[in-house]
Amino acid sequence: MGSADDQASRMREGTVEVVGAGEAGRARDRSPSGSARGRGGVRTALRARLAAGLADAGFDLEDVTVTRAGSRSVVRVVVDRDGGVDLDAVADASRLASELLDAAETDGQGLVAGPYVLEVTSPGVERPLTEPRHWRRAIGRLVTVRDRDGIVLAGRVLSADESGADLAVATDPARPGRPPRRRLARVTFAQVARATVEVEFSAEAYDDLSIESVETPSLSAVLVEPGETADLGYGEPDDDLPAAPGRESNDDGREAGPRGAAGKEMTR
């Protein structure tokens, strides 16, 4: 890493790079004579400068924020892409974003006045789903949706298009040896006030459902109050969706336990 004097010298030359787990950044000394804008204007200018260049490399610019950290600003850039963003992708996006900002300064369009640190990172797991592409990338994940009237629905994303998404919604608790009952629910994005992906420590496996020719209700028809369950009132339950295996019962109705040392089934 070098001595403190070496680090200070390199910082003055604008060549210090900072790379951390899950994010990459570059620290640069900038002249305080750069363009002075309000914070909202800086964000807009940064987004305009970065979005197209990142898109050409296959990245979606999800967010840009500018905050103060002591004598510097921190420019935080959030990127995503289909298939997810790993550390190598974050490093690539960081280099590209730094080059784009360097080019802006060379053109006399310094976007952030004074020294700043550039941080590039991927979205958090619980980031809001605000674009169709967010829903597409959340297929297979459990989400919680709140509509504009404050009513809540929870389900697993099965598919998504430009106007909405189809969820598998549990309607009854799982029975031993049987998967929980589920119904298809259609979520229309125009009705959604907020939607987030839920963190799961042990996610169940779900097979694809066939939703062709199924008349799915609107979000307002299937949303439930917190603590309640929804019964969408059409079709048979999708019991072919696997759940964690339950215990089996033998012929006389007693629950079958583990087998003994000799392989004989033990009952309780």
Swiss-Prot record:
Classification via Pfam families: RimP_N
Region (Disordered): 1-41, 223-268
Compositionally biased region (Low complexity): 32-41
InterPro entries (alphabetical): Ribosome_maturation_RimP, RimP_C, RimP_N, RimP_N_sf
Subcellular location: Cytoplasm
GO biological process: ribosomal small subunit assembly; translation
Domain of life from the UniProt record: Bacteria
Keywords: Cytoplasm, Ribosome biogenesis
Biased composition (Basic and acidic residues): 248-257
GO cellular component: cytosol
PANTHER family in the record: RIBOSOME MATURATION FACTOR RIMP
Family statement: Belongs to the RimP family.
Name by which UniProt lists this protein: Ribosome maturation factor RimP
Organism whose genome encodes this protein: Frankia casuarinae (strain DSM 45818 / CECT 9043 / HFP020203 / CcI3)
Gene coding for it: rimP
